[in-house]
A protein has these predicted regions:
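Helix-to-loop junction immediately C-terminal to a conserved catalytic motif
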Residues: 54
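ABC ATPase nucleotide-binding domain
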Residues: 8, 29, 65, 424-426
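ABC ATPase nucleotide-binding domains
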Residues: 74-238
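Conserved coupling/switch loops of ABC nucleotide-binding domains, chiefly the family-specific signature
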Residues: 60-63, 213, 432
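The feature captures the beta-strand-to-loop junction immediately N-terminal to the Walker
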Residues: 39-41
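Conserved ABC transporter NBD signature motif
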Residues: 62-70
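Non-catalytic connector elements of ABC transporters
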Residues: 254-445
Length: 445
């Protein structure tokens, strides 16, 4: 096998004839021997990037570079990249041994040398006993190993893998992802791996590149991308269960900051280091991201941590822990959590609220007692310049307002809350992530 190489894309763009922008100016570098995953939902452009790198598609603009040198269009020998497809692409009329040997038949190796190479690779992947079978006689996991073996057989300079485990059952998938990652590292093979499965991406890769609508959102080590997401999409896409996304408005009285969630508040006291960057955003709408482990049940709400109050809506027992869904009455993001879309941009709180809050609105009443705030004279009918935030639900959410602002938390076994009972949740402010109306991270220090 020849020396492994680095792979890079330079402002790579692909526009299909119907006008679909599949890849939009993506620049990624994969170092020699590095394992990088391209992660994102269906249609984000990750498989198209892989095909562009392999030479199976021609870019509309931009370049693919191997060891820093641009490569010409087409999948010719100047690339020497082995690709493993989602459907394995094995020849059904050939035996396993013949499938593995196929790329060697195109090179200078003698039949004896090729057979020795096949035997060596089969032993490495534990498929020696399958060499005389045909693909139709193999399980999904066995076919995947054969596809990997064929990729290893030629003089490959890098592996390109397009969702290779998506057709494998869940029980075998965990085993195979460990095998694939270990094999790539043992061979010190440069690997570009496409997946929509965040578990695969986070457990296998040296670095993860998160894509959305053809654009690179963020790239970095898995732990860094998870802990320090740059955009709302990355924060929402990574993590199981999905992060809780709540709409809030910033109110900055003297000294401190209040995050107004519609029916509840998260208060940051004057001495909190997060206050200063938020005071400049008085009345702005933001999205609060709280992962499941940022919220924990507490029996006594009088502690130093801010709390959210709610009612248990459902309990999903997973054996070692439970996922508990709690209705808080707070405001979900305008476009809904399921779509992972960013909030609409460019508006301040005063432009987003109805003209009048309902009588007895708890946040308004509480704030009025805490911080007197005069009503402006003859405010415009479409603007609100006083504090307060009143829930306005998306059409998709109007049918179930009782579940608005539901959050999911992790609860250890064996003591679990019951459906319908009230619950108080402490908020870990160190895990609170805030994003502006364009979906960009607000740095809190």
């Amino acid at each position: 096998m020849v020396a492994v190489v680095s792979i890079a894309t330079d402002r790579l763009t692909k526009v299909f004839p119907d006008g679909t922008v599949a890849v939009d100016g993506v620049s990624i570098e994969v170092g020699s021997g590095e394992f990088v995953t391209l992660l994102g939902p269906t249609g984000c452009g990750k498989s198209t990037i892989l095909r562009l790198v392999a030479g199976l598609e021609e870019p509309t603009s931009g370049r693919v570079l191997i060891d820093g040198e641009p490569v010409r269009a087409g999948p010719g020998p100047n690339r020497q990249l082995s690709m493993v497809f989602q459907d394995y692409a094995l020849y059904p009329h050939l035996t396993v041994a013949e499938n593995i040997r196929f790329p060697l038949s195109l090179g200078p190796d003698s039949p004896a040398a090729a057979s020795a190479r096949v035997a060596e690779i089969a032993d490495q992947l534990g498929i020696t006993g399958l060499l005389d079978r045909r693909p139709g006689q193999l399980s999904g996991g066995q076919r995947q190993r054969v596809a990997m073996a064929r990729a290893m057989a030629g003089e490959s300079r890098a592996f390109l893998l397009d969702e290779p485990l998506s057709n494998v059952d869940a029980g075998l998938r965990a085993e195979l992802r460990t095998e694939v990652a270990a094999l790539a590292r043992r061979l010190e093979m440069t690997t570009l791996y496409v997946t929509h499965d965040q578990v695969e991406a986070m457990t296998m890769a040296d670095r993860v590149a998160v894509l959305r609508r053809g654009r690179l959102q963020q790239i970095g080590p898995p732990g860094e991308v998870y802990r320090d997401p740059r955009t709302l999409f990355v924060a929402a896409f990574l993590g199981t269960p999905r992060a809780n996304l709540l709409q809030a408005a910033i109110y900055a009285p003297d000294g401190g900051v209040l995050l107004d969630l519609g029916s509840q508040l998260i208060e940051l006291p004057p001495g909190d280091p997060r206050v200063r960057p938020l005071r400049e955003r008085h009345t702005e709408r933001v999205t609060c991201v709280l992962r499941a482990d940022a919220l924990s049940p507490v029996p006594d709400p009088s502690g130093p941590a801010p709390v959210l109050r709610g009612v248990v809506r459902s309990v999903e027992n997973l054996g070692h822990e439970a996922l508990v869904r709690v209705t808080t009455g707070t405001v979900p993001t305008p476009s809904g959590q399921a779509s992972l879309e960013q909030p609409t941009s460019g508006q301040h709180l005063s432009e987003l609220l109805a003209d009048d809050l309902p009588a007895g609105h708890p946040v308004r009443d509480r704030l009025a007692r805490m911080i007197p705030h005069p009503r402006p004279e003859q405010p415009p009918a479409t603007a609100r310049t006083e504090y307060g935030f009143y829930p306005v639900y998306d059409p998709e959410l109007r049918g179930e307002p009782a579940d608005a602002g539901a959050v999911v938390i992790r609860v250890p076994m064996p003591v679990l809350p019951r459906v319908g009972e009230p619950i108080t949740l402490a908020v870990d402010l160190d895990q609170l992530l805030l994003f502006d109306t364009s979906g960009d991270r607000i740095r809190l220090g």
